[in-house]
């Protein structure tokens, strides 16, 4: 995706291409998160019905619903990316902005991929 944005923006606007790549990745993660919320509601219905069956049988061990790990992973990724964005913008404002921005972009993208 980075190379597609680089081709659209050209060499002169390389930091913009880097920023668009990060923004695209964040939006993709948000889309995954939104779809996982739909799945989570389905999981809640399934586990709630299983809990009711266990209670009717009076079994001591109920099935307890816990949050899926991919939601937690998404929140950690989003939090770390938001922490890096101010640094990214600070590097853009300096004279050597393109070099630092591309370095920061590679660090952020390597974390996501």
UniProtKB/Swiss-Prot annotation:
GO terms for cellular component: membrane. Its main location: membrane. Identified in a screen for mutants with decreased levels of rDNA transcription. This is Regulator of rDNA transcription protein 7. The lineage of its organism: Eukaryota, Fungi, Dikarya, Ascomycota, Saccharomycotina. Keywords: Membrane, Transmembrane, Transmembrane helix. It is a multi-pass membrane protein. It comes from the Eukaryota. The chain crosses the membrane at residues 13-35, 70-92. It is found in: Membrane.
């Amino acid at each position: 995706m980075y190379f597609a944005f680089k081709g659209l923006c050209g060499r002169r606007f390389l930091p913009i291409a880097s920023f668009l790549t990060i923004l695209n990745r964040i939006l993709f993660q948000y889309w995954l998160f939104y779809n996982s919320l739909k799945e989570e509601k389905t999981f809640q219905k399934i586990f709630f019905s299983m809990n009711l069956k266990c209670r009717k049988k009076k079994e001591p061990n109920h099935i307890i619903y816990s949050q899926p790990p991919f939601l937690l992973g998404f929140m950690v990724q989003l939090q770390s990316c938001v922490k890096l964005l101010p640094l990214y913008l600070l590097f853009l404002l300096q004279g050597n902005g393109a070099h630092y921005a591309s370095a920061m972009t590679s660090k952020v993208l390597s974390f996501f991929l």
